[in-house]
């Protein structure tokens, strides 16, 4: 048996994988990664070149064979040089010393964030990335795959463009107050915008700026601070991305500060120095802003990054190390990264607070003040600060005094109201009848578009989505107890139409721009009318039309008066049962004369011109919530100031007797579970 197999003639030095032909005449085996090398065997079976002489480590030690590919015989000899060492003067890029000379260590050759080599040497950072070289912006090459990912194909249902009523935006009233307000623009042109940005705007199929963009672009390009109020879905994200990206393309990156004496860099620079910082309240909103930033920074030297809580911090750190020029962040995670020494704000030129009122509602004011006032961010006079939101109650405008300088106040449309593109319907439905009425509505409207259903509790979101699945309706749910991966997957399935019904808690109510939502159903009405405004604002975006249905019963009578006013403002039909319940008197003492957050008489006006320059009485206090309030406190926490008062209402910002119902870190539940 052994003789027939010639086992006795075998030796360790002989193998069919040897570089010489074996006894059967077959060609020598060449590993796949070496088959195209000139020193390898030809495809017709010609013998391979002899291997290099063994090094001092012995014949079997590939680590000691300097003539072979580094990393051993399994390494890809054609792989790029990832060493942080600088190039050899004679052009040799391998690790092997040449002619007895060892290359000097170059700490900027690899992993320099912020510029990726483009600031100094001008090298591109990756496929499709541009560079800044010799004081000029050089766009990168086009990449069809990336373009398809960012901008979609023509008529792509997942990419929403302007709707049939977009032209009606020109009729929306605009108020801009401040000194020397720049004239608005009417088109995406150069000047004031950079040509490369205009090319990306064209790829995104944007044709005409929205009213907020018409005013915000020249205001920001002229170096002014801005506080902008606009309806949801009116293009606020483009309102701040367009001007800051355009100026970045024209002015280039800022130099990285030199390390302090005694500090050394070991190749990869661990601290990032972004020039633009965008703060937003939730993971979903920062992810959405990041996607828009990637779109309009396509083929440029600007590298956007996003960081938020609830996700793996290691992957976010690696993303930052590869380069971070524009950072989109939630306040909590940003404070964490600053404490770790991984992000410095010393180079910040632009600070943007998006959905600022929601961030204060969620109890983020201490983190925001620490980021803006307690770290190394430039002084208010040395940066541009922009605030964007759909509502600006008085406490936000008071915050603007500390963060903004000589700002322009921009109010577009009836801020805090709803779009006339949304057809609003209010149905009287008792709690035990809601599921059957919901099924009737879904059967009537079908699943041709996307339907977003809002509920108040996480348990109800899971319960209702399971019920719809049992009724053969493709539904999914999103709420704060889901992991980040589950939430992202649910949103992706909803956006793509594979699961056209999404049941959500308020986590998805503000800021999310989900294309082609045709129907919003308020299964549970919120207790605050502003939350209702932002919920139904998920449809009827960018001039498209939509339907909003609300289930109302006597348990919601606290918002009946505001709801009636809202329907009248938007020229919608007011059901008779709403008027009847309002006349019963229960709805007329609940809000202190229509004084909810953001919906007081002055919520859309420049407070510098109201009440003696921010010194007058608040517009949303009153006796309905515990008597007169002093200064700007007390509206939600009895008569005590809402900033640290002892009453601590459900929306308070501290206080020993309560805590923020929306995740105030001082509240009884600790930090919020939403973000």
Curated annotation (Swiss-Prot):
Transmembrane segments: none
E.C. number: 3.6.4.13
Reactions catalysed, as given in the entry: ATP + H2O = ADP + phosphate + H(+)
Signal peptide (UniProt feature, chain positions): none
InterPro entries the UniProt entry points to: DEAD/DEAH_box_helicase_dom, Ded1/Dbp1_DEADc, Helicase_ATP-bd, Helicase_C-like, P-loop_NTPase, RNA-helicase_DEAD-box_CS, RNA_helicase_DEAD_Q_motif
Keywords from the UniProt entry: ATP-binding, Cytoplasm, Helicase, Hydrolase, Initiation factor, Nucleotide-binding, Protein biosynthesis, RNA-binding
One GO molecular-function entry: ATP hydrolysis activity
SUPFAM superfamilies: P-loop containing nucleoside triphosphate hydrolases
Residue intervals of the Helicase ATP-binding domain: 217-410
Low complexity compositional bias, start-end: 665-675
The organism's place on the tree of life at top rank: Eukaryota
Positions of the UniProt region annotated as Disordered: 1-141, 583-605, 647-675
DEAD box (motif): residue ranges: 354-357
Compositionally biased intervals (Polar residues): 10-25, 89-99
Motif Q motif location, chain numbering: 186-214
UniProt entry tagged with the keyword RNA-binding: yes
Compositionally biased tracts (Gly residues): 113-129, 586-599, 647-664
GO CC aspect terms: cytoplasmic stress granule; spliceosomal complex
Gene Ontology biological process: cytoplasmic translational initiation; negative regulation of cytoplasmic translational initiation in response to stress; positive regulation of formation of translation preinitiation complex; regulatory ncRNA-mediated gene silencing; spliceosomal complex disassembly
Predominant localisation class: cytoplasm
Family (UniProt): Belongs to the DEAD box helicase family. DDX3/DED1 subfamily.
General function of this protein: ATP-binding RNA helicase involved in translation initiation. Remodels RNA in response to ADP and ATP concentrations by facilitating disruption, but also formation of RNA duplexes.
Classification via PANTHER family: ATP-DEPENDENT RNA HELICASE DBP3
Domain notes: The Q motif is unique to and characteristic of the DEAD box family of RNA helicases and controls ATP binding and hydrolysis.
Name of the protein in question: ATP-dependent RNA helicase ded1
Gene: ded1
